[in-house]
A protein has these predicted regions:
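NAD(P)+-binding Rossmann beta1-loop-alpha1 motif at the extreme N-terminus of oxidoreductases
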Residues: 1-59
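Residues in the short beta-alpha loop(s) of Rossmann-like NAD(P)-binding domains
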Residues: 35-36, 94, 327
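Internal alpha-helical scaffold of NAD(P)-dependent oxidoreductase catalytic cores
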Residues: 36, 137-226
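Rossmann-like NAD(P)-binding element
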Residues: 55-89
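Rossmann-like NAD(P)(H) cofactor-binding subdomain of soluble oxidoreductases
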Residues: 77-131
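Interdomain hinge/lid region at the active-site interface
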Residues: 206-276
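A conserved regulatory-domain signal marking ACT and ACT-like small-molecule sensing domains
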Residues: 279-364
């Protein structure tokens, strides 16, 4: 088992405090610093971290430093932490990697760059602040690591070992590839959600009842529109070229759909929906990236208490649910639950569920 680390967290918002909570739970000593004294005090109360009066005090004896501040300040603080913590691996948690990495390479002392590893935990929420933090924010997520040509591979491996110890899955890739991929699966969804919500709000001026008709689908699609405007402005500008390309691809697909609808090409419309449905169901059913888990598919009727019956059955079997996702049928009346459990518990889970008349089927 990996030995305990001395963790320093610079920036105690949602992600920073969640990392602190995960580290404390894993048995690490944790110090934190934030320029906002109130945020630091709330983070200390929630996570158990020891508050520091300065960045230097926070990182002085750390072995791993997480810089968890807004994107514009990341590079400068990473450079400062590298100098103030001569024995520590220093990483950031920014959603944009190429821009931040190039700034770090330009600003930090070249002698310290072997200890810098760019990072991006693929977790979070539309909520913000230390009061919303939880170790579950990083538990089970993919955590991208982007070393540079100057990074010591041992620094990457040390950070990866810590990430695995707190229950996340490290994935190594270069910064440019990271930015291209997250532009599609992380940044574009935020833009689409924001634009759709803005469109509906504008239409409300002429049609006051439009949002009264907004049901579950609209609410699901616009959840991200409640995210921090300041945070997302920094992210979009920091990854502007990749996001612009993703928007071009997305706009092209929307225009294709418009043309198919106007031309009454029913088969093409149905085919587009079918392909997307198949891809979405495959995404839902995929197991966690981490090894040793299994996914069980369970169709359920739409009635009160059925989900409690399902989870109670697994509780009686002593099976821990690592993840649970629900896909609702468009026709209503039924849904499908996808359960992620430990691979060595999957057979027992299936047996208990079938004994209670659930049609459990192991997918992976």
């Amino acid at each position: 088992m990996t030995s305990a680390e001395r963790v320093a967290v610079v920036g105690t918002g949602l992600i920073g405090t969640s990392i602190a909570m995960a580290a404390v739970r894993a048995g690490d000593a944790v110090r934190g610093f934030d320029a906002d004294a109130d945020a630091l005090a709330r983070a200390a109360e929630r996570s158990g971290l020891v508050p520091a009066g300065s960045l230097g005090e926070c990182v002085s004896d750390a072995t791993i430093v997480f810089v968890c501040t807004p994107i514009p300040s990341l590079a400068g603080l990473v450079a400062e932490a590298l100098s103030a913590a001569p024995g520590a691996v220093v990483t950031d948690v920014g959603s944009v990697k190429s821009h931040v990495t190039s700034q770090v390479l330009a600003e930090a002392d070249a002698a310290h760059l072997a200890r810098f590893v760019g990072g991006h935990p693929m977790g979070g929420s539309e909520r913000s602040g230390p009061d919303r933090a939880s170790p579950s924010v990083v538990d089970g997520i993919v955590w991208v690591l982007c070393g540079t040509e100057r990074t010591d591979p041992a620094a990457v491996e040390r950070l990866a070992a810590w990430i695995e110890r707190v229950g996340a899955s490290p994935v190594r890739m270069d910064a440019e590839r990271h930015d291209r991929l997250v532009a599609v699966v992380s940044h574009l969804p935020q833009v689409a959600s924001t634009v759709l919500m803005g469109l509906a709000a504008t239409e409300e001026a002429g049609e006051p009842e439009i949002l009264l008709l907004a049901a579950g689908g609209f609410r699901d699609l616009t959840r991200l529109a409640a995210s921090s405007p300041h945070l997302w402005s920094d992210i979009l500008l920091g990854n502007r070229e990749q996001i612009a390309h993703a928007l071009e691809l997305y706009t092209g697909r929307l225009l294709e759909m418009r043309d198919m609808v106007l031309a009454e090409r029913a088969r093409d419309v149905e085919s587009a929906f079918a392909q997307a449905k198949e891809a979405r169901l495959a995404l839902t059913a995929k197991p966690q990236v981490k090894a040793g888990v299994a996914v069980i598919q369970v169709p359920i009727p739409d009635r009160p208490g059925v989900l409690a019956e399902l989870t109670s059955a697994l509780g009686e079997a002593g099976v821990n649910i690592e993840d649970l996702q629900i896909v609702h049928s468009p026709e209503g009346g039924r849904g499908t639950v996808y359960l992620t459990v430990a691979a060595d518990a999957a057979e027992e889970a299936e047996r208990f569920l079938r004994a209670r008349w659930f049609e459990a089927l192991r997918l992976a």
